[in-house]
Each structure stands twice: as structure tokens, then as C-alpha cells.
Amino acid sequence: MNELIKAINELKKEKNAIILGHYYQKGEIQDLADYVGDSLALAQWAAKTEADIIVMCGVHFMGETAKVLCPDKKVLVPDMAAGCSLADSCPADQFAQFVKEHPGYTVISYVNTTAAVKAVTDVVVTSTNAKQIVESFPKDEKIIFGPDRNLGNYINSVTNRNMLLWDGACHVHEQFSVEKIVELKTQHPEALVLAHPECKSTVLKLADVVGSTAALLKYAVNHPENTYIVATESGILHEMQKKCPQTTFIPAPPNDSTCGCNECSFMRLNTLEKLYECLKNESPEITVDPEVAKKAVKPIQRMLEISAKLGL
């Protein structure tokens, strides 16, 4: 393991590469990455890096976002099969048709989408900035929000809007069991529930804190004295435990106890071995059709500009 990590670091230096890791990656990848963060942070780092090569340890759409923002850089992913159930729930042709059927609507897309979906979007959001970006539009603005219906419903509730929602969802966040969380709360009455807004509303009603992975991490760091039940992909527990070694974090259980459904199987496809091979061979490489990229970059840049103004 140590030899492999050493070899990766040597290749990284030799090729002037940067490794970006999402909070849902395996712990050893998070520890090796130059920067670890949520989707917004990864996009921000990609946009300003001076590295020649960006290795995106996350899922495919994150690599696409980096490539759209940095068309002249080489963007690699350790495993091209690392997709996203949420992005897959929103095929670009179907979403484009949906937009066409609703003229006069502003289109807001969650970052968990393909570049082709972003290309028919007015502004992109992440779970960190979705509320603030939606609130930046007039109250009577007609908005299409996609693809996550759970996040859309949550944003509708906290902004008092009635956005038109695409019917997509993340398979991990859909799986959390209300009954089992209630049971855990009974066993640990002092525990606070931290939940990601991609969870169903029935889970969010049990939550003491609802927020993006970065927001949930920040809350735990600021209140390390609490015990937490964490309803998001379990990879975040690595960083939480690292930052708060004395704190007890309990992963919220899924409905199906026979599977590791609170883990994203796509995120887990990335390994140190694949990361080494990816850097060594400079492959697999993310490519985005230049015409699609030209359209997709505008809503992403708009998100980054609004986020910068809001201090996010």
C-alpha cells in the first residue's frame, strides 16, 4: 500500500497532475487526494487549478464538469464505469423534450447531470447552493428543476416555491429506512440526525440538520460533543471521524439490511490501483463534445459566479 501511494505521488509530480476526491470516495483515496470536497468544491478547485492533468476521483459527471470548465486540460477518471444513478435518471434527450414542452420556464439543473443536460440548462446548482440560487430568482419565476425530485421538494418547501420537478432520484439516498432511523433514535436518544436533502421527505422530517455533505461535516466539526446518525452516503464518515475523532457517528441504515445500500457502488469502483494505472497511462480520459461543452459551461460558470458572490 505504501509503495503504491509513493508511486502515485511520484507520477503526480512528474506529470503535474492534481487529484480531486469526493467525500464519498474510499478513505484511502480521500487521504491521498490533494483536495477533498463536495461537488461545488471540486468544481471550484478544477476551475482554478494550474495543473496540466486533473484526476477526478468521483463519478463520471464530475469529470465532465471539470472538462467543461477546463477544456485545455487532460481530465482523467480511475474508472469510466463510475456513473451516477441520479444522472442516469435524466436522459438528455428526454429532459430537452421536457424543457421544450414548457416554454418560458427557467431551467435549473442539479450538478449530478450529464454535460448534455447542463447544455439545456440556465443555471446549475449543488446541494450547497441550491436554496440560495433559487432564492435569487423572483418569487413568480416559473422554474423547472431537475433531476432530483427529493432535493427539488426540499427546496420548494424551504423557499416556498412551486418548481416543476423532474422525477429522478439517487438510489443511495432513496434507500434510508425511516423505521430503522426511529429505532436508532430510541437506542440513542441524545443523537442528532444529519441528513442530505436528496433523502426522501419522510427521512428529512426526522432530521435535526439538513444540508450538503460539506454542510453536515461543518456542523459536526462545530459541535463535536454530539452523537450523530448520518443519513447520506457513508463515505463522508471517514472525513467526519478524521476531523472529530472523539465523536460517535452512526450510519443511517438502508431498508434492505442485506446490502450496503448506504454506499454508492459507483463511487466504490475507484481504487488506488486504478488511480495508479490511470495516472501512468493517462487513461481513461474524459471527453465532451465541443458544441455541448460550449453550451454547458455557461450555466456552470453562472453557478460559480453566484456562489462566489454569496461567499459559498
Model regions and ranges:
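Active-site loop-to-helix "anion-binding N-cap" substructures in soluble metabolic enzymes
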Residues: 1-211, 215-230, 237, 242-252, ...
